[in-house]
Amino acid sequence: MPADYTSTARALSLPMSPAESLSPAEEDTRPLWSHLASSRRNTASPSVRESTGLRDQVVNQATKMLRRTKKTWRRLTFWQRIGAIGAALLAILLGLSFMIFTGQVFFWLGPVAEKWEQSWLAFFVLWLCVFFVSFPPLVGWSTFGTISGFIYGIWKGWILYATATVLGSTCSFIVSRTILSKFVNRMMERDKRFAALALTLKYDGLKLLCMIRLCPLPYSVCNGAVSTFPTVHPLMYGLATALITPKLLVPAFIGSRIRILSEKNEEMSAASKAVNICSIILTIGIGVFTGWYIYRRTLARAKELEAKERADIRRSLEADHAAHRPHGSFSEDPDVNTAATTLARDEEERIGFNDFDDDNVDLVIDDDSGSEISPNLTKKQFPGPYRDEFTDNDSDVFGDGDGPDSQMFRLHTHVRSG
């Protein structure tokens, strides 16, 4: 009984927080349930932490998106809200109609596919369709790729799809940049996130562009969005699109399998049908997983490059402030310098530096007679701002008397107008 009482009392006296490891003698005196609870807690904690962390990330992202949506909604006027609701309903209707149309188009193409396969006019018309859907906000790029494979087979359809995609995306990039030039300049000067993303393309621009092109993003919208980054050149964007053209084999392959299933459905055995259907499903799954994985890697790489760029700018700002010299240009490229300057303003706010002119406030001190100093004083009368820099040879400013009748001191300090 005393032994049980002693072990129970010792177990109850253990702290709630994780304690240091006990000696072997003390470990033997711990009750059995203490060992079981400790082992169960240590075993379950990694998975619990992982699931909790993933759940928290999803909840945080959803909360941020909801908060941003509410904030944007409150800023809209009455008619803007009506227009937003109408645009959302129209987008839903167009999406449903497009899904229905996509399902029916292969039934319509079945009887004419063999005839169109030998027609160069049909080849050119389909090529133009792929070319023009590269311009935002048109849709149907993936559907036309599947149709190319359906009519011309995997390899000829891929050639049609790839060439039209490369030329169309490059032309869309150039046109979008010309039309959206004012929007680009405004975004570069005001939006720090936009400036940061533009600077990330300065390091491994071609590699990051290829990753962006492989992401499952709306094709035409992506062409217009990337064109707003001034650090991306049209030829580089066209080269990145050409490098990822093997990805376009996926819709062409799916289209060719659909034609085989539609034409030889009665002649094919159940095993052949299963192989074709499974190949389509597997190809779609590989494409979705690859796009999702590359999308995650692209975001991670963009964050890494942004952190590196911010660190370089922060070091430059701290060095300039320590040496009491003005900030120079960050790059000889004007577009890169504009983006870096926007990011530098954000870093100055984070660090606490302020070099704005509104911090230099002129204070006018009147004498007893009420006379005021004219605002048109020359720099010759007052050669420079007042500085708190004294040496042993300086006299006491408070012991020299009042000095002139009135003085104006330029104080480098924060003064808020009352």
UniProtKB/Swiss-Prot annotation:
Lumenal side: 1-81, 141-157, 256-273
Residue ranges, annotated region (VTT domain): 149-258
UniProt record, GO biological process: mitotic spindle elongation; vesicle-mediated transport
Region (Disordered): 1-26, 367-388
Cellular component annotations (GO), alphabetically ordered: Golgi membrane
InterPro entries hit by this protein: Golgi_membrane_TVP38/TMEM64 (IPR051076), VTT_dom (IPR032816)
Cytoplasmic side: 103-119, 181-234, 295-418
Pfam families (UniProt xref): VTT_dom
UniProt keyword terms in alphabetical order: Golgi apparatus, Membrane, Transmembrane, Transmembrane helix
Top-level taxonomic group: Eukaryota
Compartments in which it is found: Golgi apparatus membrane
Polar residues compositional bias, start-end: 1-10
UniProt domain comment: The VTT domain was previously called the SNARE-assoc domain. As there is no evidence that this domain associates with SNARE proteins, it was renamed as VMP1, TMEM41, and TVP38 (VTT) domain.
Protein name: Golgi apparatus membrane protein tvp38
UniProt source species: Aspergillus fumigatus (strain ATCC MYA-4609 / CBS 101355 / FGSC A1100 / Af293) (Neosartorya fumigata)
